[in-house]
Every structure is written in structure tokens, then in C-alpha cells.
Amino acid sequence: DCPSGWSSFKQYCYKPFKQLKTWEDAERFCLEQVKGAHLV
């Protein structure tokens, strides 16, 4: 199951964000959202 507000696709959870960030900042932001999350 995915966290509230996230979408499931092929056994993974996804959530788009529209904020502009560097790749490093975006990856850090993902990790802050859900443990184990990564930028794709």
C-alpha cells in the first residue's frame, strides 16, 4: 500500500512534485517524504 496521496504502479509508489530543485535537493526532499523514497 502507498502512503495517502501517492499512486501505485507496478508495486512501487509515486508522487509528482512541481517544485524546481537541483537533483541533489530533490533526492533529499524525496527522502524526507517517505523513508526509502528516491527520485526517479
Swiss-Prot record:
**What keywords tag this UniProt record?**
Disulfide bond, Hemostasis impairing toxin, Platelet aggregation inhibiting toxin, Secreted, Toxin
**Has the keyword Flavoprotein been applied to this entry?**
no
Tissue specificity here reads: Expressed by the venom gland.
Residue ranges of the C-type lectin domain? 1-40
| Chief location | secreted
Q: One GO molecular function term?
A: toxin activity
Q: What GO cellular component term, any one, is given?
A: extracellular region
* Location in the cell: Secreted
Disulfide bridges in this chain: 2-13
Stored Gene3D superfamilies: Mannose-Binding Protein A, subunit A
Keyword Nucleus tagged: no
Its family?
Answer: Belongs to the snaclec family.
What does the record give as the function of this protein?
Platelet antagonist that specifically and reversibly binds to a site on platelet glycoprotein Ibalpha (GP1BA) close to or identical with the site for vWF binding. It inhibits the binding of vWF to platelets and vWF-dependent shear-induced platelet aggregation.
Oligomeric state and interaction partners are given as:
Heterodimer of subunits alpha and beta; disulfide-linked.
This chain belongs to the protein called: Snaclec tokaracetin subunit alpha
